[in-house]
Amino acid sequence: MDITEKLRLITRNAEEVVTEEELRQLIETKEKPRAYVGYEPSGEIHLGHMMTVQKLMDLQEAGFEIIVLLADIHAYLNEKGTFEEIAEVADYNKKVFIALGLDESRAKFVLGSEYQLSRDYVLDVLKMARITTLNRARRSMDEVSRRKEDPMVSQMIYPLMQALDIAHLGVDLAVGGIDQRKIHMLARENLPRLGYSSPVCLHTPILVGLDGQKMSSSKGNYISVRDPPEEVERKIRKAYCPAGVVEENPILDIAKYHILPRFGKIVVERDAKFGGDVEYASFEELAEDFKSGQLHPLDLKIAVAKYLNMLLEDARKRLGVSV
């Protein structure tokens, strides 16, 4: 795979790369660059998590070494449970990411507690605290914090640690949703002041919830890896998908970010009287037909549910989920 093809694959469906020139230089000069994503262990792995898992798979194909940080201490600071509860969920998350297709032989899974309690790391947290204003730390955390009003001091430490993870894990590329941008910019600006390199950052879009609103576990507006096929079909049928509307359309987003990258195409099956089957090899073609009214929302939903269940089938089997 040449440099141009690697760049195309790495940046496919990315919201932003900071910066593309630095990314090109990285893959031109380093044989096996390292990339990472950090995840707070979560009881439900859903299509939102799969956005970055898919990007890690793209990076593996492009020759990157992958580190998956299961951020147990971050989860504790963000009030996600006791250490014992978080450890159990972290083990489950590792199994899910592998079941979804991440190549275990080319990925290293690390618990934050394996290194974040070391003397050197804690000292770096204190150094980072000395050069970061309270307002900057709070702004960096606002997008990902569980407690928006009256935040705890622990939540101010969180972004400092996340920035330092990049240095202490020795990675070249930090990957995350666009909601991580402020933390990554903090890392780019302040890590060099502590003697570390500034990372390249790649941000994926935030997948809209099935109701067209922000995806949230409390709202239940997501599809979980553990959802059985009939539940996936039910959720897709009920999902927000207004005719002709392309922007913030969750069904089109699923096709764009999950189905087309995995299958390379999507075939919408229709009766001959409705135009017959139609195959789309690009999102642009799919979006154009949907916007013009040539593709009906129900036909799109049926196709998306079918492909999504195909995508999740292997993961369910590997996890031992009965369907």
From Swiss-Prot:
Q: What GO biological process, any one, is recorded here?
A: tyrosyl-tRNA aminoacylation
Q: Where in the cell is it found?
A: Cytoplasm
Locate the motif 'HIGH' region: 41-49
Which residues are listed for ATP binding in this entry? 217
Q: Which UniProt keywords apply?
A: Aminoacyl-tRNA synthetase, ATP-binding, Cytoplasm, Ligase, Nucleotide-binding, Protein biosynthesis
The UniProt catalytic activity note for this protein reads:
tRNA(Tyr) + L-tyrosine + ATP = L-tyrosyl-tRNA(Tyr) + AMP + diphosphate + H(+)
Q: Where is this motif: 'KMSKS' region?
A: 214-218
| Quaternary data | Homodimer.
> What is stated as this protein's family in its record?
Belongs to the class-I aminoacyl-tRNA synthetase family. TyrS type 3 subfamily.
Stored HAMAP family: Tyr_tRNA_synth_type3
Name this polypeptide is given: Tyrosine--tRNA ligase
